[in-house]
């Protein structure tokens, strides 16, 4: 089991880097920046992710009277947005990939400055090093994305050849990562039963989906992407802060459990959206 746990960081690295490279090879800089010109949509995305979700997490914690450590884990996820898995969810759901990438980058950059400012207000004793968060997100996500975009712009033939390989690597590493997380954390998930932690994860995910959908504007694609993007939190940033700041292991366990619960719900929803679109050409979200 210890060996499997050690394989998770390496598998995560392969998944994130290969996914970001493949995304860059599939898009142009103009396609990524275009959705961000819609100032109203950008403001609504920031409202959903950095106002509604942090205070939503805080409210769920109080409503369910969670153990303090479990509540801290939930609030950590509420303040951490910009997940590398969002573009993959958008691909599965067959929705607007360019907006998904643009939203991911926007939320990730804001998270770097947002968490150190807001967490001490919501959690007593919390302190966050923005440099450590920024370093991991820039090196693992922004840099590979930039390399892919540059290669797409300068070497289109090579980019077209490399992208299918990276797509396969990304898909296989995602499957492996999901299995590893569940196998190595199964006992931790069981320990959460009876604490209302799993219920909190379900409520948190449903709240995020609803907030993103309602604030996503008139376009069906933007509503779907913002719903998925608001519900899929930045697990890496939440784990980084949880491990460095809090001594109680239940904080990290709660982050993992809520992330796993949310991932299952979002994968099912994304697959349903894709199947519905394939059958009718219309997505019901």
Where are these regions (language model features)?
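Alpha-helical transmembrane segments of multi-pass small-molecule/ion transporters
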Residues: 1-285
């Amino acid at each position: 089991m210890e060996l499997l746990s050690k394989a998770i960081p390496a598998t995560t690295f392969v998944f994130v880097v290969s996914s970001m490279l493949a995304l860059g090879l599939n898009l142009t800089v103009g396609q990524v920046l275009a959705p961000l010109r819609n100032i109203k949509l950008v403001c609504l995305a920031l409202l959903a992710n950095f106002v509604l979700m942090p205070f939503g997490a805080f409210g769920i914690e109080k409503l369910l009277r969670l153990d303090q450590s479990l509540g801290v884990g939930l609030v950590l996820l509420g303040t951490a947005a910009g997940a590398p898995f969002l573009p993959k969810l958008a691909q599965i759901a067959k929705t607007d990939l360019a907006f998904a990438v643009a939203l991911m980058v926007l939320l990730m950059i804001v998270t770097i400055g947002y968490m150190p400012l807001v967490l001490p207000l919501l959690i007593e004793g919390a302190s966050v090093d923005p440099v450590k968060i920024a370093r991991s997100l820039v090196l693992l996500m922004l840099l590979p994305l930039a390399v892919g975009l540059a290669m797409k712009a300068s070497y289109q033939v090579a980019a077209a050849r490399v992208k299918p390989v990276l797509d396969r690597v990304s898909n296989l590493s995602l499957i492996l990562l999901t299995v590893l997380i569940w196998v190595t954390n199964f006992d931790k998930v069981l320990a959460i039963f009876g604490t209302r932690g799993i219920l909190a994860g379900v409520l948190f995910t449903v709240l995020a989906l609803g907030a993103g959908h309602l604030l996503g504007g008139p376009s069906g694609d933007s509503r779907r992407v913002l719903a998925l993007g608001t519900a899929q939190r930045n697990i890496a940033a939440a784990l980084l802060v949880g491990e460095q700041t809090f001594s109680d292991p239940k904080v990290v366990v709660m982050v993992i459990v809520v992330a796993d619960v949310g991932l299952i719900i979002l994968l099912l929803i994304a697959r349903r959206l894709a199947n519905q679109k394939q059958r009718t050409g219309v997505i019901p979200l």
